[in-house]
UniProtKB/Swiss-Prot annotation:
Keyword Chaperone: no
Organism taxonomic ancestry: Bacteria, Bacillati, Actinomycetota, Actinomycetes, Mycobacteriales
Catalytic site: H468
Keyword Nucleotide-binding: no
Name of protein: Uncharacterized GMC-type oxidoreductase Rv1279
Cofactor: FAD
């Protein structure tokens, strides 16, 4: 049976859960939120160190890219959350806002209301930073928001050794989430008492007690219903039936950097020639839908270690420690430390993040490891390469074509930056605090020393996504942008996009924090 609501929100992830929650604070306003996946009842969701067990499960969209020529022709696995909380229910819980300059760059492209000075108040509104490390985070952080953020409870000693090795190599310590967090630090995490705390936990579940909010799970949006030049609802499929939920005011797409552009194109909003290839009538010619795809590529170097890695996280003692005290290895977010560095000294800002995981997180975590190990490597946080999302067919259940075009920039800047980052990692591996803890090279395979050939091999065979796609429904002040600075889709009234797809340029950080920010900002823009 079809239904009506003031607002229809598609997706309940990092941004969608926020939008649905905030819009429903007005008891006179009705909101329906559509989630393709189930409730977040999978037992591994709450256990921080277990997130890779959610890969290719029933709560994962389980995407693959097209073969990447610069990465040995491999198809790269892209997990995306298909569950209440979206990817915030299966990510590594790293709360890394990025640099103030990233948001000022957004403002240059989309107006002053997206500057760091403007969005800082939203971060404070979001965050509930535990008192135990508030002195570390400083006045920039929030302490009364709904999203719990804390220090790690039981980081591994080898993580401390990696940080010490970075310092010995001349890199400074940094305060996490400061306006310019250049340097190295232990990761702060979206956890509460040692368990994952997703946007479903922070925003959606408290709001679901409201009578004016309906959250429909197992409801896959198939297109936006458009009457003339106005969005009037969303068609979705549930239990094998096709239904429509009508929106009296607005439809808000929060389906993420893959699914939001796919939905726009399925609804007739996109490049007219591409839509015609799939016999989709053009509602509005928007050539940039699906373009400007940005992602953070990571290359991991793997090493055998004797002990103290998360390979032992499922041992009985660790299970008991977690169940009784919420301590031990199972509280680990895996990516326990990171640092921002420059591939070239003349750069104004870091273009690389180095990440450390005290775990044998090899082969995109799709193959069970054989023993103890650790990984670390560079992440390209300011890529020059741009990719694209396109339709594979007009079937809404067909996975879209994901073409990130990693390392494809004509000047070779991205490749040079990653190689520079790998050389820094090799230096850190050989520094005194760490070198005696590392055994044989586990990745890339069949390597015995960290020479240039090994680093080149790692770039080709050990690179994968850090799970941060963005930019495919670019926000901007220019007429070519997909959405305007108020997140309204150009050419169609009553339709907005609010998720990582609207980011007009990269963030030198992780996309969860700015996606939550976009959700908060979107709710204010809609209500104003």
């Amino acid at each position: 049976m079809d239904t009506q609501s003031d607002y229809v929100v598609v997706g309940t992830g990092s941004a969608g859960a926020v939008v649905a929650s905030r819009l429903s604070t007005d008891p006179a306003t009705t909101v329906v939120a559509l989630e393709a996946g189930p409730r977040d009842k999978n037992r591994f969701i709450g256990v921080p160190a277990a997130f890779s067990k959610l890969f290719r499960s029933e709560i994962d969209w389980d995407y693959l890219t097209e073969p990447q020529p610069e990465l040995d022709g491999r198809e790269i696995y892209w997990p995306r959350g298909k569950v209440l909380g979206g990817s915030s229910s299966m990510n590594a819980m790293m709360w890394v806002r990025g640099f103030a300059s990233d948001y000022d760059e957004w403002a240059a492209r989309a107006g002053p209301r997206w500057s760091y000075a403007d969005v800082l108040g939203y971060f404070r509104r979001i965050e509930n930073v535990t008192a135990a490390w508030h002195f570390v985070s400083g006045d920039d952080s929030g302490v009364t928001g709904p999203l719990h953020i804390s220090r790690q409870r039981s980081p591994r000693s080898v993580t401390a050794a990696w940080l010490a090795a970075a310092r010995e190599c001349g890199f400074a310590a940094a305060r996490p989430n400061s306006p310019r967090p250049e340097g190295f630090c232990e990761t702060v995490v979206t956890q509460r008492r040692g368990a994952r705390f997703s946007t479903a936990d922070a925003y959606l579940k408290p709001a679901m007690r409201r009578k004016n909010l309906r959250v429909l799970t197992g409801a896959t949006a198939t297109r936006v219903v458009i009457d003339g030049d106005r969005a009037v609802g969303v068609e979705y499929q549930s239990d094998g039936q096709t239904r429509i939920v009508y929106a009296r005011r607005e439809v808000v797409l929060c389906a993420g950097a893959v699914n939001s552009p796919q939905l726009l194109m399925l609804s007739g909003i996109g490049d007219r020639d591409h839509l015609a290839e799939h016999d989709i009538d053009t509602v509005y010619h928007a050539p940039e839908v699906g373009c400007n795809l940005l992602d953070h590529l990571v290359t991991v170097l793997g090493f055998d270690v004797e002990k103290d890695s998360l390979f032992a996280a499922e041992k009985p003692g660790q299970l008991i420690s977690y169940l009784l005290r919420r301590r031990g290895m199972l509280t680990s977010n895996v990516g326990e430390a990171y640092g921002f560095v420059r591939s070239r000294p003349e750069l104004k800002l870091p273009d690389l993040e180095l990440i450390f995981a005290p775990a044998p997180f090899y082969d995109e975590a799709l193959v069970p490891p054989a023993g103890h190990g650790v990984v670390f490597g560079p992440i390209l946080v300011a890529p020059q390469s741009r990719g694209q999302i396109t339709l594979r067919s007009a079937d809404p259940h067909a996975k879209p074509v994901i073409e990130p075009r990693y390392l494809s920039d004509l000047g070779g800047v991205d490749r040079a930056a990653m190689m520079a980052g790998l050389r820094i990692c090799a230096r850190i591996a050989q520094a005194r605090p760490l070198r005696d803890l590392l055994g044989s090279i586990a990745r890339p395979r069949n390597s015995t020393e960290l020479d240039e050939a090994t680093l080149e091999l790692a770039l080709a065979t050990c690179s994968h996504t850090l799970y941060h796609p963005m930019g495919t429904c670019r926000m901007g002040s220019d007429e070519a942008s997909v959405v305007d600075p108020q997140l309204r889709v150009r050419g169609v009234d009553g339709l907005r996009v609010a998720d990582a797809s609207v980011m007009p340029s990269t963030v030198r950080g992780h996309t969860h924090a700015p996606s939550v920010l976009i959700g908060e900002k979107a709710a204010d823009l809609i209500r104003s």
